Amino acid sequence: MKALWALLLVPLLTGCLAEGELEVTDQLPGQSNQPWEQALNRFWDYLRWVQTLSDQVQEELQSSQVTQELTVLMEDTMTEVKAYKKELEEQLGPVAEETRARLAKEVQAAQARLGADMEDLRNRLGQYRNEVNTMLGQSTEELRSRLSTHLRKMRKRLMRDADDLQKRLAVYKAGAQEGAERGVSAIRERLGPLVEQGRQRTANLGSGAAQPLRDRAQALSDRIRGRLEEVGNQARDRLEEVRDQMEDVRSKMEEQTQQIRLQAEVFQARLKGWFEPLVEDMQRQWANLMEKIQASVATNSIASTTVPLENQ
């Protein structure tokens, strides 16, 4: 049933994500390449990557693993958002407490909406798996259609809230810049290592999220290759065995043919031995008969000639 869940989920996500790829780019035109934005992109990139695997690897995937990977990516995204927010709070400097509280509240609300969107998406996938498990082989077209519609709505809502959070953080950052004009140089020196660290963390997280699945795909490929080689060796051994059997049959047939030929020659010799004396005896009798007939004819001819002479 887990294999069925993976097979149904992956094609569905393929269609949803393929339709929404351009839409995601259009909804975040002003991306500043912040770590939290990269983490959010990895959340969707992971789903896109799953659908590129072969059917055999998709059958190997367990729904619990997909959920765990999504959970890790969600936590990474929210962690980066909190880290970026904390970084901006440290830069606010002498800003009015009322302004600080208002900005913090707006960012917190946008952050909560984004987290709720990702949590809702993960829960919806789990609910879909449970519904598939209870259908016991029945048609899942209606269920897939409903989930597809829900995922499209969730994608739009997620990108809308991400865009809203991006704008709130931009305002937050603007307030920080206004409140810390005298410390611009120091802030830039601090932001440089943080940005580089975020990029490095992004690269590590990106490769770390996909590496377990790549390892499983490679292991499965090795098993399939080994199985094919084993089947090929068995087929070759069987072919050699059949060839040997055919050679034995051919040898036996040639041997039997030779025996039949010898038996026929012996039988022919026997027949010749039986009939030759009869033929020779018949030839002798025929020759004697012909001699007797010729002698009788000659005697009759002489007798016929003698009688007329006596009458004269």
Curated annotation (Swiss-Prot):
Residue positions binding heparin: 154-157, 221-228
Signal peptide (UniProt feature, chain positions): 1-18
Sequence segments annotated as region (LDL receptor binding): 150-160
Gene3D superfamilies cross-referenced by the UniProt entry: Apolipoprotein (1.20.120.20)
PTM characteristics: APOE exists as multiple glycosylated and sialylated glycoforms within cells and in plasma. The extent of glycosylation and sialylation are tissue and context specific.
Annotated region (Homooligomerization), positions in chain: 258-312
Keyword vocabulary terms for this entry: Chylomicron, Endosome, Extracellular matrix, Glycoprotein, HDL, Heparin-binding, Lipid transport, Lipid-binding, Oxidation, Phosphoprotein, Repeat, Secreted, Signal, Transport, VLDL
Residues with Methionine sulfoxide modification: 135
Matching InterPro entries: ApoA_E (IPR000074), Apolipoprotein_A1/A4/E (IPR050163)
GO MF entries: cholesterol transfer activity; heparin binding; phosphatidylcholine-sterol O-acyltransferase activator activity; phospholipid binding
NAD is among the record's keywords: no
Gene Ontology annotations of biological process type: acylglycerol homeostasis; cholesterol efflux; cholesterol metabolic process; lipoprotein metabolic process; melanosome organization; phospholipid efflux
GO cellular component, one term: extracellular exosome
Chain positions covered by the region annotation Lipid-binding and lipoprotein association: 202-282
Domain of life: Eukaryota
UniProt Sequence repeat ranges: 72-93, 94-115, 116-137, 138-159, 160-181, 182-203, 204-225, 226-247
Sequence segments annotated as region (8 X 22 AA approximate tandem repeats): 72-247
In-chain residues carrying the UniProt-annotated modification Phosphoserine: 139
Family: Belongs to the apolipoprotein A1/A4/E family.
Job of this protein: APOE is an apolipoprotein, a protein associating with lipid particles, that mainly functions in lipoprotein-mediated lipid transport between organs via the plasma and interstitial fluids. APOE is a core component of plasma lipoproteins and is involved in their production, conversion and clearance. Apolipoproteins are amphipathic molecules that interact both with lipids of the lipoprotein particle core and the aqueous environment of the plasma.
PANTHER family: APOLIPOPROTEIN, APOLIPOPROTEIN E
Record protein name field: Apolipoprotein E
Name of the gene this protein is made from: Apoe
